[in-house]
Amino acid sequence: MALLAEHLLRPLPADKQIETGPFLEAVSHLPPFFDCLGSPVFTPIKADISGNITKIKAVYDTNPTKFRTLQNILEVEKEMYGAEWPKVGATLALMWLKRGLRFIQVFLQSICDGERDENHPNLIRVNATKAYEMALKKYHGWIVQKIFQAALYAAPYKSDFLKALSKGQNVTEEECLEKVRLFLVNYTATIDVIYEMYTRMNAELNYKV
């Protein structure tokens, strides 16, 4: 769990404004999460998350004051790009980033909730499938869906996944899951607010890749 516990997201302020700098710093440590899943087929999600973080940071770095919060980014780009928005810039990058982050959230929450295949309780295929279907599947075309279905069957045993997540530390499964639950508190709240922001600003796009 060391992988997640070292970089907790900040608690949300009362106004639910997410500061861009600290957010990008925290999520920039998440791509190695996909290495814990073992299969190289998860590499595209890892690369997508890394690439979108880089795109958002490039915009943020041009004017950290103007782009202080994630909402600032959407508001400024909406005015800047006009009819092209939200299909451009950091707005588009954050739209895809939140989906990758949601995959991680649903996957970890499903494991913490004890959801499993009773016939194969040490497999995490059920958890990974739920996360993919909730976060990413509807944005993927048929070919990409087939690739990920293959990846889900290559997912590691839960015990091996939790060991990788703990960076080999000698901790019990319950200790690891307790730290995952702690990580999920601010992480889930933050992702929920980003989704709400996209809905409120009518910035969500449903095209497939």
Curated annotation (Swiss-Prot):
Residues 45-66 are annotated as: 2 X 12 AA approximate tandem repeats. Sequence repeats lie at residues 45-55, 56-66. The modification N-acetylalanine is found at A2. GO terms for cellular component: cytosol. GO terms for biological process: ceramide transport; intermembrane lipid transfer. Beta-D-galactosyl-(1->4)-beta-D-glucosyl-(1<->1)-N-[(9Z)-octadecenoyl]-sphing-4-enine binds at D48, I49, S50, G51, N52, I53, T54, K55, H140, Y207. GO terms for molecular function: ceramide 1-phosphate binding; ceramide 1-phosphate transfer activity; glycolipid binding; lipid binding; lipid transfer activity. It comes from the Eukaryota. Detected in brain, kidney, spleen, lung, cerebellum, liver and heart. A ganglioside GM3 (d18:1(4E)) binds at D48, N52, H140, Y207. Its main location: cytoplasm. InterPro entries: GLTP_sf (IPR036497), Glycolipid_transfer_prot_dom (IPR014830). It is found in: Cytoplasm. Keywords: Acetylation, Cytoplasm, Lipid transport, Repeat, Transport. Pfam families: GLTP. Accelerates the intermembrane transfer of various glycolipids. Catalyzes the transfer of various glycosphingolipids between membranes but does not catalyze the transfer of phospholipids. May be involved in the intracellular translocation of glucosylceramides. Belongs to the GLTP family. Monomer. This is Glycolipid transfer protein. It comes from Bos taurus. The lineage of its organism: Eukaryota, Metazoa, Chordata, Craniata, Vertebrata.
